[in-house]
Curated annotation (Swiss-Prot):
CDD domains: CCT
GN (gene name): pcyt-1
Acidic residues compositional bias, start-end: 321-331
Residue spans of biased composition, Basic residues class: 346-356
Keywords on record: Lipid biosynthesis, Lipid metabolism, Nucleotidyltransferase, Phospholipid biosynthesis, Phospholipid metabolism, Transferase
Protein name as it appears in the record: Putative choline-phosphate cytidylyltransferase
């Protein structure tokens, strides 16, 4: 346990040097001394009733004076009030813990004894349990609200049994439990003024937990087969085990197929986006084609000799082409002029020969 202490601050005294404060009360924030005691859970499990610690505690109890309900509520018993609660506590769950918590909080100072029924009586009167009696004993004794555990508690509890344990009160819910010769097992404790009523936790019980397991039986069997349990350990036949294994394979393929489709969807989005970027009018392919055309047109024209002030690129190519065409035209004109001159010479020679001939030659 730990103790938290807050100290009270001293008040300021009046002085003669401040007469203006004589008729004014000086108030200062102060807190009273408070001791907050909180019990912490033990790091040891609760003892069994036949162990030395429980026996010593029981023998030290003065059971000669009957503890009434009023005395217990007012914490006037002079010792911890001993309360007994019993049950099967199969598959110990929060509904069981809530019942024991309610009992522990009945009075300011409670010593809680929990009786756990053994397998023999439980199987006889209620049916088979999921966990064994030893597992149920250990499950209860590790609950923080429990001070002592009574193993193989009687199925039909009696007043004499409680007195032997020096129990002051017995706690249970208000549902009647039929016993041989009795309509309600706990009615006699009501008459003795020893009965305390607890409330059941709605929505949870051992039967509900078992019902959930049965409802989803196939899922749990398939899961445990995947985890390495053998069909024999699960009490499953060969055909049933084969069916579950096939179902597991089918589910695995479905899962992989869904994953593949999801991956393909994301990849297809990327492919479509790349296609649009490539073949769009402003895309990469058209830009590449434009660059390729420019390169090919430049490769077909002679490279200009680089000098300062000379045109470059397409302009230079066009200027060069015009100059070549002009030179070719001049050459053709020269050839034509030369042919005309030659033709004139031939005509002159023929005319001179004709003049030199006599008439007899004709």
């Amino acid at each position: 346990m730990f103790i938290h202490k807050q100290e009270k601050m001293p008040q300021r005294k009046r002085t003669m040097d401040s007469p203006q404060e004589e008729d004014v009360e000086v108030k200062k924030k102060a807190t009273e001394v408070e001791y907050v005691v909180r019990s912490l859970a033990s790091d040891e499990p609760a003892p069994f009733s036949d162990e030395a610690l429980a026996i010593t505690t029981r023998e030290a109890v003065d059971y000669s004076k009957k503890i009434t309900l009023a005395m217990a509520e007012a914490n006037e018993a002079g010792r911890p009030v001993r309360i007994y609660a019993d049950g099967i506590y199969d598959l110990f769950h929060h509904g069981h813990a809530n019942q024991l918590r309610q009992v522990k909080k009945m009075f300011p100072n409670v010593y809680l004894i929990v009786g756990v029924c053994g397998d023999r009586d439980t199987h006889k009167y209620k049916g088979r349990t999921v966990t064994s009696e030893e597992e149920r004993y250990d499950g209860v004794r590790h609950c923080r609200y429990v001070d002592e555990v009574y193993r193989e508690a009687p199925w039909f509890c009696t007043v004499e049994f409680l007195k032997n344990l020096k129990v002051d009160f017995i706690a249970h819910d208000a549902i009647p439990y039929v016993a041989p010769g009795e309509e309600d097992l706990y009615e006699k404790f009501r008459r003795e003024g020893m009965f305390l009523e607890t409330e059941r936790t709605e929505g949870v019980s051992t039967s509900d937990v078992v019902c959930r397991i049965i409802r989803d039986y196939d899922k749990y069997v398939r899961r445990n087969l995947q985890r390495g349990y053998s069909p024999k350990e699960l009490n499953v036949g060969f055909l049933a085990a084969s069916k579950y294994q096939i179902q597991n394979k089918v589910d695995s393929l479905k899962s992989k197929g869904i994953e593949l489709l999801s991956t393909w969807k994301s990849k297809s989005d990327d492919i479509i986006r790349d296609f649009i970027d490539t073949f769009h009018k402003d895309g990469g392919l058209n830009a590449f084609g434009g660059r390729l055309k420019g390169i090919m047109s430049m490769s077909r024209s002679p490279s200009p000799s680089p000098h300062e002030g000379s045109p470059t690129g397409i302009e230079h190519h066009l200027e060069t082409q015009d100059e070549e065409e002009e030179e070719e035209a001049l050459e053709e004109e020269k050839v034509v002029e030369q042919k005309i001159v030659e033709k004139k010479e031939v005509v002159k020679k023929r005319s001179s020969r004709n003049k030199a001939k006599t008439p007899l030659e004709y």
